[in-house]
């Protein structure tokens, strides 16, 4: 019987390394690949834990040698710049706060990498994500990881049925501590490697500076205003701010104020008291459903408005033009345009979309 072939994306970290080991132990014919995404026109600064960096390639190659699996580096530079970096920069210029990891998953890891895998006759792609995939009731379902603290389903809500059918995520059945334990047991040097947490293409995590360098003619100073339009001070460019931000505003008003809105048309940043950043209703676009084919009517769910948020009770309702209205039971802090909102029903990912506006 021919072994099923799987191409696994290896970042050089402990999760994808152990995922490769687990798949080999399960009898798959495993091929390791690292996506080459760093941009040669920029000075590339190394950072410990950086995903897909130059040192990450070396770590991934050493793991592949240890596991005795083939290993390749694939050039994804152009696609990464077009689908992730340019998108990231454009969204901030439009006054929104994007999630580049979700774009990377959607366009690179589970689209282009899957196409390349199919091109060499592979049956699956695999990653080290903490999530589970199961077929239930005739649909492939995305299910929360065993390790709730490390669950990564929020960043995977865009996966289609075809992508889920051809994707393996073995780490979803384990806790992070157990994954590190397995890595140590089998002698992988990356067993204690630090997790990558920041944006991989911005080494110092200063996104404002990065965007200014990438699009210097698009960022200009403007006014801080209150909700009535009264000028309160000067800002250095809307790309430096996000909803709910308090620190780094440089305003001395004798009272704490928070960013409540960003207007790219007038190039203004609206600030106000903390109660102004609590809202209950939003509209989202670019919807992808997983557990259901489409939303026929109102559905009670739990929803997350950002990666680090706790799921909160909400009702989702279909709107015209493919939009979905999300109404939370309790007010949510700093709902931010450009971020994703993801819907859950128990352990299943119902779907999600991009936050377009607040009501």
Swiss-Prot record:
One of its GO terms (molecular function) is tRNA binding. Keywords: ATP-binding, Cytoplasm, Disulfide bond, Nucleotide-binding, RNA-binding, Transferase, tRNA processing, tRNA-binding. The keyword RNA-binding applies. Its EC number is 2.8.1.13. It is found in: Cytoplasm. Pfam families: tRNA_Me_trans, tRNA_Me_trans_C, tRNA_Me_trans_M. It is an enzyme of class 2 (transferase). The record marks 129, 339 as: Interaction with tRNA. Signal peptide: none annotated. ATP binds at residues 9-16, 35, 128. Disulfide bonds join 104-200. One of its GO terms (biological process) is tRNA wobble position uridine thiolation. It comes from the Bacteria. Residues 150-152, 306-307 are annotated as: Interaction with tRNA. The keyword Nucleotide-binding applies. InterPro entries: MnmA-like, MnmA-like_C, MnmA-like_central, MnmA-like_central_sf, Rossmann-like_a/b/a_fold. It catalyses: S-sulfanyl-L-cysteinyl-[protein] + uridine(34) in tRNA + AH2 + ATP = 2-thiouridine(34) in tRNA + L-cysteinyl-[protein] + A + AMP + diphosphate + H(+). Its main location: cytoplasm. One of its GO terms (cellular component) is cytoplasm. Belongs to the MnmA/TRMU family. This is tRNA-specific 2-thiouridylase MnmA. It comes from Clostridium perfringens (strain 13 / Type A). The gene is mnmA.
């Amino acid at each position: 019987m021919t072994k099923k072939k799987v191409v696994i994306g290896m970042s050089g970290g402990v999760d994808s390394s152990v995922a490769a080991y687990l798949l080999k132990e399960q009898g798959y014919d495993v091929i390791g690949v690292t996506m080459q995404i760093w941009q040669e026109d920029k000075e590339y600064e190394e950072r410990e834990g950086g995903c897909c960096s130059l040192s990450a390639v070396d770590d991934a190659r050493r793991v592949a040698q240890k596991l005795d699996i083939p290993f390749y580096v694939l050039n994804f530079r152009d696609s990464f710049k077009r689908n992730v970096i340019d998108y990231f920069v454009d969204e901030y210029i439009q006054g929104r706060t994007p999630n580049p990891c979700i774009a990377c998953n959607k366009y690179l890891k589970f689209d282009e990498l899957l196409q390349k895998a199919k091109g060499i006759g592979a049956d699956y792609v695999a990653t080290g994500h903490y999530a589970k995939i199961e077929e239930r009731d005739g649909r492939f379902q995305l299910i929360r990881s065993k390790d709730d603290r490390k669950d990564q389903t929020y960043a995977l809500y865009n996966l289609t049925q075809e992508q889920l059918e051809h994707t393996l995520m073995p780490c979803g059945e384990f806790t992070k501590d157990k994954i590190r334990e397995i890595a140590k047991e089998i002698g992988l040097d990356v067993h204690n490697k630090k997790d990558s947490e920041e944006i991989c293409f911005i080494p110092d995590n200063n996104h404002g500076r990065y965007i200014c360098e990438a699009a210097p003619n698009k960022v200009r100073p403007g006014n801080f205003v209150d909700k009535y339009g009264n000028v309160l001070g000067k800002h250095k460019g809307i790309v430096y701010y996000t909803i709910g931000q308090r620190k780094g505003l440089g305003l001395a008003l004798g009272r704490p104020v928070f960013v409540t809105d960003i207007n790219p048309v007038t190039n203004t940043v609206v600030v106000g008291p903390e109660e102004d950043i609590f809202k209950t209703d939003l509209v989202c676009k670019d919807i992808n459903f997983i557990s259901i084919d489409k939303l026929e009517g109102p559905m009670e769910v739990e929803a997350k408005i950002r990666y680090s948020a706790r799921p909160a009770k909400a009702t989702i309702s279909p709107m015209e033009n493919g939009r979905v209205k999300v109404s939370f039971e309790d007010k949510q802090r700093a709902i931010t345009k450009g971020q994703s909102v993801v819907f859950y029903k128990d352990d299943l990912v119902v779907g999600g979309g991009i936050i377009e506006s607040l009501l």
